[in-house]
Amino acid sequence: MEKYYILILLFPLAGFLFNILIGRFISPKVVSWAGVLSILGSLVVALFAIAQVFSGKTIEYNIYTWILSDDLKVSFGYLIDQLTAVMLFVVCFVGWLIHIYSVGYMHGDPGYPRYFAYLNLFVFSMLMLVMGNNLVMLYFGWEAVGLCSYFLIGFWYHKKTASDAGKKAFIVNRIGDFGFALGIFLLFINVYALNYTDIFPKIPGLQGHTLNIFGWNIDLITLIALLLFCGAVGKSAQIPLHVWLPDAMEGPTPVSALIHAATMVTAGVFMVARLNPIYGMSEIALAVVAITGAVTSFFAATIALVQRDMKRIIAYSTISQIGYMFIGCGMAAYGAGIFHLYTHAFFKALLFMGAGSVMHAMAGELDIYKMGGLRKKMPITYITFLIASLTIAGIPGFSGFFSKDEILWAAFASAKPYGKFIWLLGTITAALTAFYTFRILFVAFHGKFRGTPEEFKHVHESPPIMTVPLIVLAIGSVIVGYFSIPHFLEPVIPKPVFAAPHEQERVVMTMSIIAGVTGILIAGYIYIVKSTVSARLAKTFSGVYKVLWNKYYVDELYSFLFVKPTLWIAEKFIERFADIKIIEGIVNGIPKLIYKTGLLIRPIQTGQLQQYAIFMIAGIIIFVLIILNI
Amino acid sequence: MIPLSWYLLLSATLFSIGLIGFVIRRDLIVMLMCLEIMFNAVNIAFASFSYYNSNLTGQIFVLFSIAVAACEAVIGLAIVLALVRNTGINHSDEIVNLRG
Amino acid sequence: MNPLIEQVFYVYFFISLTILSIAVIASKNIIHSAFFLLIFLLHVAAIFLFLNAEFLMIIQIIVYVGGVLALFIFAIMIMNIKEEFRHKRFVKFSIAGLITGFLFLAGLYIFLGTVKSPENVLIKSDVNSLGKLLYSYYFLPFEILSLVLLIAMIGGIIIAKKTPFDREGK
């Protein structure tokens, strides 16, 4: 039975091959059926696996030994334990819903087969990432999802902004992946194993080992954990490698929903949770993770306050929420982090798909200040969007409340000195989150329409193929919070240690509810009751507003520090000097040399018969003389 | 008694003169005649070897040599004829089509 | 035969053959060259006679003089070579040719000075034993030679044929 779980991986791969090879020659209907059915097949088999895991079993199976060389044994195998089961459910279920949504969203697009092929390839890569039982499969899936992200962000490659965004995503990802690879190498050198089950018992033995770099002794486990975290920073768009995610909104909206909300960007969190024995042994690494997460979440939330592009606001919201997940992991409450990952997949995908629905109705317009009063014409979209916004704001009863609360309680109650500070930052961010999410809701769906009447006439509710997934996700957003993931994950994820009495949990809960409600009320006041306040606020704090609007000028900073010098070196030095002079000199010079030599030798052939005869005789004489002398 | 080396010297002299003539003259037909001189020099050498080793093999070889020389003269003259007919050139230093 | 007479005849042949061959290669007129070649061939036939090879002498006269030389004369006649006024006889690089040739000759002389001369010479040779040798030991080369002659005949005809282009027009 166990070996059939490879079908979870094979179905999307088959879908990819089918659509990329012959998708062009068949009708779009067949393409969409192939794409959706492959993921459905994965989901069904995954449900079987999850059922087995529910009964307490862990599935491990090696399919094929890839590299077998002395100490290095790398195999394709999968490990399905509770953590993998959670991720499997998220990827397959949300992925399936998004495939169905895409059928309606991408209808009529000329690249239809290519889209579904890449989407299937992405699901395959993500599944390989979560199901792998060794670091090599993790890395393989890691790189592959980055690649698919590049494909899908730059899907409409004729647009320069889209292809630039794809390149940016891939390059920034690569920078993180470099650290990730170094971490894997360092780990391998010290434990000589790559399977999780082989590595984890050996980690305690590495405690206290140090690595000598330029005279400083750095603790080995901390170094490994930090290097691995580099990859997570790149993949999950935390500071300082967050710059690719807002630009990634150039891709189709279902792509944003799947990749940049539910699955790929959460791979970093999954990695930290999966490798928690390593992180658990290094206080410094955990601190770095937590503080990075906290700072990122606050930082991204502030940017989201003033943006006008609906998808961009939701993108910054994603960055902020992943920051929460890293806060959870950094506080050694990995279960809470994964729990938030799980609920976040539902409500964030819902937000993105709602935005896609609005885009569909507004003929591609995304500026919320060009919309307004849409709730009358798009009731289903409005209600699902409302549910998602309530969830993200942490209103009790919805799933976001449970997961966010776990994280904030873990931050508050941890024994670490910075715990309370992170809790404070997290609570303020929760208020900001509620504010900007309801800002979208109130500006776009309430009030009066700010465009022309013809556009308003065009606004319509999306077809059922797009709204049914919205409804399913909305239902999910509400109910999944009641299933306690951290409890489910206990066999593989250690429970956090709480240093505060349990009664204070109520206080923390109340504080976060107050923060959320405050955010909603302020947003309501500014955008519904008195709609001139926002303009006045912008003018009064114009300096702050400008910085926030320009995203703290991070892109410009990177362009100045890294991009322009690299381009300068490439053009001036490499192109002018090394390429033209040296390499082309050699490549052109060798034929020239041969030619000149040939020109020198050419006059020997005169075409005169008797001259050849003289040469022959001379040759014979010399030859005979040589023989006779010997 | 004339020693063998004298006949061989005679053959060598005739051969060299034929060789020099082949390399020097411009006329194609004279070149072919010089080839004939060379052939005859070699025949003399073979015949003298046959005489001095009292072995008839040398004479058989001269027979073959004469026959082959005749064939070669035929073909050579045919080629020269075709050349002169097609290009009007009958001097060897004007035929330089195979120049490098 | 008297050794002295032999030596006189040898000296005569040496000088005459040398002068004749030089005359062949140095004549201005091609017909003169051809006739010098004729006398040369007859002298060579005489040498064959000296070497007790009468059959070779006859064959030499019949084939070479009567066949090859006649062919040369016919070819010269057919080609209709117009004698240009003061056309050059020698190629430009004749000096190099002369030097190489002399070197060759010098090399041969040095080498051939060391050849030893055996004592027992051929007393007489007759066609009978020549024929026996030809048809037993050297039968294969004999047959192949017949093929060669056939091919040379065909080849000569084909190469020297007048093409239809040559027939008309010119």
Curated annotation (Swiss-Prot), chain B:
It is a multi-pass membrane protein. Pfam families: Oxidored_q2. It catalyses: a quinone + NADH + 5 H(+)(in) = a quinol + NAD(+) + 4 H(+)(out). GO terms for biological process: ATP synthesis coupled electron transport. Its EC number is 7.1.1.-. The keyword Transit peptide does not apply. InterPro entries: NADH_UbQ_OxRdtase_chain4L/K (IPR001133), NUOK/Mnh_C1-like (IPR039428). GO terms for molecular function: NADH:ubiquinone reductase (non-electrogenic) activity; quinone binding. GO terms for cellular component: NADH dehydrogenase complex; plasma membrane. It comes from the Bacteria. The keyword Magnesium does not apply. It is found in: Cell inner membrane. The chain crosses the membrane at residues 4-24, 29-49, 60-80. Keywords: Cell inner membrane, Cell membrane, Membrane, NAD, Quinone, Translocase, Transmembrane, Transmembrane helix, Transport, Ubiquinone. NCBIfam families: PRK05715.1-2. NDH-1 is composed of 14 different subunits. Subunits NuoA, H, J, K, L, M, N constitute the membrane sector of the complex. Belongs to the complex I subunit 4L family. NDH-1 shuttles electrons from NADH, via FMN and iron-sulfur (Fe-S) centers, to quinones in the respiratory chain. The immediate electron acceptor for the enzyme in this species is believed to be ubiquinone. Couples the redox reaction to proton translocation (for every two electrons transferred, four hydrogen ions are translocated across the cytoplasmic membrane), and thus conserves the redox energy in a proton gradient. This is NADH-quinone oxidoreductase subunit K. It comes from Thermodesulfovibrio yellowstonii (strain ATCC 51303 / DSM 11347 / YP87).
